[in-house]
Amino acid sequence: MTKETASFFTDRLAAADPDVLTAINHELNRQRKQIELIASENIVSRAVLEAQGSVFTNKYAEGYPGKRYYQGCAPSDEIETLAIERAKKLFGSEFVNVQPHSGAQANGAVLLAVAKPGDTIMGLSLDAGGHLTHGAKAAMSGKWFNAVQYAVHPETQLIDYDQVRDLALKNKPRVIIAGGSAYPRHIDFAFFRKVADEVGATFMVDMAHFAGLVAGGVHPSPVPHAHITTTTTHKTLRGPRGGMILTDDPALAKKINSAVFPGMQGGPLMHVIAAKAVAFGEALQPSFKEYAKAVVENAQALAARLKERGSDLVTGGTDTHLALVDLRPLGVTGRDADCALERAGITCNKNGIPFDPLPPVKTSGIRLGSPAATTRGFRKAEFLQVADMIADVLDALSSKGEQGDPAVETAVRQRVEALCDRFPLYPEL
């Protein structure tokens, strides 16, 4: 073995590429010192990190367990089968595909499996809390399909179920989609299934945001109602970034497998599937139920305190891991709010609210989520403190204008760092 070959297999990142290590350490320090409230983000275990950084990253494994196109796939079959079986047990589903690289890939594969370009699909509109992949004009789902969007009621800001049925009867969609990225309440899956059956549609639920809450038993499961359920494997499920598709229908399972590979993707990411298996194993433990319960309780505590401090909440609160704050009464935009909060050490995202008069780059709201800080160890007492910090920053924006108040932001940042120091992340990294 040459010296160059030996160093290729032995040099750590610090020696091989210090510039990349520096950037990674910057991100590690950011995560350690900031409070993460982006609802779609979470913090994985050291075990998930280890699996995702494993030698499975070297392996191509096109196909499915027992039916690969390459040799040398026995360990890949082992890890993918483990991930599948754990997911089936976790969600009570007969068939699971763990290969989608993302939630968007999973949703795209479902549409490829059950619809043709030009078919009508129905989903919750983006400004009402839906997702790009549910028929938004800018996305593939809105360009390749005749996308009909249902909305929320202007007074309650809850899904307008009467409108859902009326639109379905009028448009006879091929696919009806429930789920979203900024809808803070439970969804009546049984109603959607009844409507889908009435018009002969395939009913798909995208549970990407609340899958971990379903796994933890604190959120109604869509799996018994949906023909097909999709999800990401991160967010509340607390695994690596990736996607997954579930169904109880063997005919649909066959179509889905073909749509994922070779329809949408080539080789699966076996190192990510290994990490998915780890995360599913973690979610099967009793402690995960306690985690999921805390996620909801913390989000509700955060929302309630913000309401006490004068914020308006879309739908008045939350049943899930996220809350949507309407900033219009404060005269503050989402863009100004998320920038000011980041300066203060709290990360969230600007977000449109139902019937938002502002464009997506500005918005009238912010979205706040509890999963990451709950993973860190925050409980109700800490979330009440966080809510007060957020309210202080928002009040300063309201009174001082879009630049905010540097003194308030500095004081909040000091409180944030003190709180973060009590709940350290990855101490051995």
Curated annotation (Swiss-Prot):
Keywords: Amino-acid biosynthesis, Cytoplasm, One-carbon metabolism, Pyridoxal phosphate, Transferase
Positions where N6-(pyridoxal phosphate)lysine occurs in the chain: 235
Domain of life: Bacteria
Site residues (Plays an important role in substrate specificity), renumbered to this chain: 234
The enzyme's E.C. designation: 2.1.2.1
Binding residues for (6S)-5,6,7,8-tetrahydrofolate: 126, 130-132
Localisation per UniProt entry: Cytoplasm
Enzyme class at the top of the EC tree: transferase
Gene Ontology BP terms: glycine biosynthetic process from serine; tetrahydrofolate interconversion
Pathway as given in its UniProt record: One-carbon metabolism; tetrahydrofolate interconversion; Amino-acid biosynthesis; glycine biosynthesis; glycine from L-serine: step 1/1
CC terms in the record's Gene Ontology section: cytosol
Required cofactor names: pyridoxal 5'-phosphate
Catalytic activity: (6R)-5,10-methylene-5,6,7,8-tetrahydrofolate + glycine + H2O = (6S)-5,6,7,8-tetrahydrofolate + L-serine
InterPro entries noted in UniProt: PyrdxlP-dep_Trfase (IPR015424), PyrdxlP-dep_Trfase_major (IPR015421), PyrdxlP-dep_Trfase_small (IPR015422), Ser_HO-MeTrfase (IPR001085), Ser_HO-MeTrfase-like (IPR049943), Ser_HO-MeTrfase_PLP_BS (IPR019798), SHMT-like_dom (IPR039429)
UniProt cross-references to SUPFAM superfamilies, sorted A to Z: PLP-dependent transferases
GO molecular function: glycine hydroxymethyltransferase activity; pyridoxal phosphate binding
Chief location: cytoplasm
Subunit structure: Homodimer.
HAMAP family listed in its UniProt record: SHMT
Function as written in the Swiss-Prot or TrEMBL entry: Catalyzes the reversible interconversion of serine and glycine with tetrahydrofolate (THF) serving as the one-carbon carrier. This reaction serves as the major source of one-carbon groups required for the biosynthesis of purines, thymidylate, methionine, and other important biomolecules. Also exhibits THF-independent aldolase activity toward beta-hydroxyamino acids, producing glycine and aldehydes, via a retro-aldol mechanism.
Family per record: Belongs to the SHMT family.
Protein name per the record: Serine hydroxymethyltransferase
Source organism: Zymomonas mobilis subsp. mobilis (strain ATCC 31821 / ZM4 / CP4)
